Amino acid sequence: MRLSRFFLPILKETPKEAEIVSHRLMLRAGMIRQEAAGIYAWLPLGLRVLKKIEAIVREEQNRAGAIELLMPTLQLADLWRESGRYDAYGPEMLRIQDRHKRELLYGPTNEEMITEIFRGYIRSYKSLPLNLYHIQWKFRDEQRPRFGVMRGREFLMKDAYSFDIDEAGARRSYNRMFVAYLRTFARMGLKAIPMRAETGPIGGDLSHEFIVLAETGESGVYIDKDVLDLPIPGTEVDYDGDLTPIVRQWTTAYAATEDVHDGPRYEREVPEERRVHTRGIEVGQIFYFGTKYSESMKALVTGTDGVEQPIHGGSYGVGVSRLVGAIIEACHDEAGIKWPEAVAPFTVAILNLKQGASDTDEACERIYRELSARGVDVLYDDTDQRAGAKFATADLIGSPWQVMVGPKGLAEGKVEIKRRGDGSRENVALEDAVARLMA
């Protein structure tokens, strides 16, 4: 993509309403625009990141055996009355009437609807286990939306729902999602730590939040620092095998949010030199809620004994749009964003330091064509901005690699390559630049 043809409305001044780093940088880098309190338009740069995060989430859900569908944003209020949550959910739920006076709501979550879909088709234990997921926009009418996409009213979520004949099967499904989440966040360059958590309005008796450590996080957390060195399961992980050892390894070391923190146990089990008290950002949460919804909504299947019984369920959420902010909180410096390569809007930024000069134009075009032909996402700054402005833009939007092409370097047959993550630089021969970036 040529920057001269791309829509990138960069702001020179930081908007006053931006309280945290991710909100400031997303506004300044032209990733989002606020349309109402807690509601944002996703501009091209931000949308590219959002789509890459969504793709990783989808790949890992599919790998773990979940099956994608798509549920509507609007739901019937009667479904929520069946489960008993319509009145209990509170003012965060946006309630709507259509022209026929039917009561609807803009779904804040989907346990009721997925249970209704399940009970409409599944009758026997032979169809289980089953895990269905979707990626959809949701709305919760936060009393005080703040922190940009970190605590907005409209947000993109991945929700998965598992259905099993008994508790043992449901816990196996829970473990699959637990491991899938470890892999999902690691692929995005994040170390997300699973922590025992409250179940809240979802219900049930088992839940883990996946927390990314960040000073601006909304949750206080207490951890044994040994958890930071635990290995992430590789691509060879067998989701049909016994995942209990992996889950046990990650849940044995102490890690808890403030809501469930056990001070005496923490001091008893964790040596003082390994205690870490900091803050974190929740990027996902998983729940086992047993028969909470299947009993109230009559989602029954015939078991091996021929008797109808309620299924055991779980739900598994990932905040897809929230992850954009969380990654920025974890990956930035004073100049701007430092995207992990897997989610960067553009992997390589080419900076033409003397636009209009035949030698720099030709060199930039050559690198641009060769990288694009190899499927690399490239942003070529072919504008007539001064070099300093181009450097500032490149650092702000955070492409992992920058290629600086100027007349002084080309006189020696070289271009400069900068790694945004650590700031390291190297001069390479023009003919070797593409190979170096592809290495």
Swiss-Prot record:
Enzyme Commission number, as recorded: 6.1.1.15
Pfam families listed in its UniProt record: HGTP_anticodon (PF03129), tRNA-synt_2b (PF00587)
Transport is among the record's keywords: no
Annotated Gene Ontology cellular component terms: cytosol
Gene Ontology biological process terms in this record: prolyl-tRNA aminoacylation
Annotated NCBIfam families: PRK12325.1, proS_fam_II
Biological function: Catalyzes the attachment of proline to tRNA(Pro) in a two-step reaction: proline is first activated by ATP to form Pro-AMP and then transferred to the acceptor end of tRNA(Pro).
PANTHER family: MITOCHONDRIAL RIBOSOME PROTEIN L39/PROLYL-TRNA LIGASE FAMILY MEMBER, PROLINE--TRNA LIGASE
Family affiliation: Belongs to the class-II aminoacyl-tRNA synthetase family. ProS type 2 subfamily.
Name of the protein in question: Proline--tRNA ligase
Lineage of the organism: Bacteria, Pseudomonadati, Pseudomonadota, Alphaproteobacteria, Hyphomicrobiales
